[in-house]
A protein has these predicted regions:
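Carbohydrate-active catalytic/glycan-binding domains of CAZyme proteins
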Residues: 1-370
Length: 370
C-alpha cells in the first residue's frame, strides 16, 4: 500500500519475504481533497478495514484522515467527521503545536487506544526551527465505530489521560564525553560521511580530520551534529586545532540547510595567530559578522545559547566568557530557509586545501535545554 505523487492511495499484494509485487496496483482512495495524500496505514477491527492517511503536506495544513471498508481492496468510505486530527482549524490554529500528521493507531495491552503522530512546535509568527517531534494522544471509538482523537481532533502539550505503566526514559546527558571511542546513534552527518575523517584519541577526544568541503557545499563535509531539542538552550564545546594552515578552521555550526547556517569558529592566520569568529550563510550571502584575536595560549570553548528570538554566540578563554553577537532565529526557520528537519548543532573542521594536515580535537560537548 503506497501513496502516489498524483494524490491517491494504491494497494497491491506483495510477498512479505521477498518484497516482490504479486498483483497489479489498485487505486483505493483519493483522500478528502488535500494535497499529498500519503503515509497509508491499514487496520482490521471488528469486521472493518480502516485506512488511515495524511494529507496537506508536513506544514500548517497537515491533517489525518480515515476511511473504511468491509473489504481490504475497497470500496472505502471516508469518515464524515474527517479530518480526525488537524490544527488547521479554529480549535488548533492558536496552538503552539502545528503540522500534525503522519499518524498511527495503537491498542494498549489494557484495551485502550492511542494515536502517535508527528508535529512541530512553533515560535511567535508561526516560525519553527525545531524539527518534527513525536506526540501521543488518547483515542476513543464513537457510536458509529469511528476513532475520535483527544475528544476534539486536536492535541495539546498536556492532556489528561488514564495512567499507563510508567517507565523512566534515559535522556541525553548534559555533558557528552567521547571516552567510549564511538558516537551514539543520535549523532548525524550530512550526506554520506567519510569514516576516516572521524576518529578518537587515546585520551578520549573526538578528532575531526579537516577537508576542503565546506558546510555550504552539496557534499559531505567533516561534520557531526545533534538536533536542537529546546527553544531555550545552551551548548558549548572546547576546540583545539592541530597542524592548522592559514585559514583552516573548526567550530560549531547552528545548521538548518547548506544555504542557511550560523558558524562559530576558531582559526589561525599564516603567522599562526589564533582568532575566533562568527559567520553567517543565508542564501547567496556569506558574511563574517565579527572576528577577534585570541591569546596565544589557553583553552578556547565555543558557546551557543538560544531563546525563541535569537541565537547568542560567544566564547570562553581560561573560563572567562566573551560575547561575539547574536543572530535572529527566524532566518533558520523552515518558513524562511526551507527544509523541515530542524536545526542541528554540528561540530566541524574545514581546511583551505587538500594538502592541509589540519585536524581538530573536541574533548566534550555540553547541551542544556530549559
Amino acid at each position: 500500500m503506497v501513496s502516489n505523487p498524483d494524490g491517491y492511495i494504491n494497494l497491491c499484494e506483495i510477498d512479505p519475504m521477498t518484497g516482490k509485487q504479486l498483483s497489479s496496483s489498485k487505486r483505493i482512495w483519493n483522500g478528502t481533497g488535500g494535497r499529498y495524500a500519503e503515509g497509508p496505514h491499514i487496520y482490521k477491527k471488528d469486521g472493518w478495514y480502516y485506512l488511515l492517511i495524511s494529507e496537506g503536506g508536513t506544514e500548517l495544513g497537515h491533517k489525518v484522515t480515515i476511511a473504511r471498508s468491509r473489504y481490504i481492496d475497497g470500496p472505502y468510505q471516508g469518515n464524515p467527521a474527517n479530518p480526525i486530527l488537524t490544527h488547521a482549524n479554529e480549535s488548533g490554529q492558536s496552538s503552539p503545536i502545528q503540522g500534525t500528521g503522519h499518524a498511527d493507531l495503537v491498542e494498549g495491552t489494557d484495551g485502550s487506544w492511542w494515536m502517535v503522530c508527528l508535529a512541530y512546535r512553533v515560535m511567535p509568527g508561526m516560525h519553527h526551527t525545531l524539527g518534527r517531534e513525536t506526540y501521543l494522544a488518547p483515542v476513543r471509538w464513537d457510536k458509529d465505530a469511528w476513532p475520535v482523537v483527544n475528544g476534539n481532533g486536536t492535541i495539546s502539550l498536556k492532556m489528561d489521560v488514564p495512567t499507563l505503566p510508567q517507565q523512566k526514559m534515559k535522556g541525553r546527558p548534559e555533558r557528552i564525553d567521547f571516552k567510549e571511542g564511538r558516537l551514539s546513534p543520535e549523532w548525524i552527518h550530512l550526506q554520506n560521511p567519510e569514516a576516516k575523517n572521524y576518529t578518537f584519541t587515546k585520551d578520549g577526544k573526538l578528532r575531526l580530520i579537516a577537508t576542503p568541503v565546506t558546510l555550504s557545499d552539496w557534499k559531505s563535509p567533516t561534520f557531526v551534529a545533534l538536533r536542537q531539542e529546546h527553544f531555550d538552550m545552551e551548548a558549548s564545546v572546547p576546540v583545539v586545532l592541530q597542524k592548522a594552515g592559514a585559514n583552516d578552521e573548526a567550530g560549531i555550526s547552528v545548521f538548518m540547510e547548506f544555504h542557511s547556517h550560523y558558524d562559530l569558529f576558531v582559526r589561525q592566520d599564516k603567522d599562526r595567530k589564533r582568532s575566533v569568529g562568527l559567520r553567517y550563510k543565508l542564501g547567496e550571502i556569506t558574511h563574517c559578522a565579527k572576528e577577534v584575536s585570541l591569546p596565544a595560549d589557553g583553552e578556547v570553548e565555543l558557546v551557543v545559547k538560544s531563546d525563541i528570538n535569537y541565537y547568542y554566540f560567544g566564547y570562553k578563554v581560561n573560563g572567562i566568557y566573551y560575547d561575539l553577537g547574536k543572530m535572529n532565529t527566524r532566518y533558520l526557520s523552515t518558513e524562511t530557509a526551507g527544509g523541515f528537519t530542524g536545526v542541528v548543532l554540528g561540530l566541524y573542521a574545514v581546511s583551505v586545501s587538500k594538502e592541509s594536515k589540519m585536524y581538530a580535537d573536541f574533548e566534550y560537548f555540553k547541551y542544556k535545554g530549559k
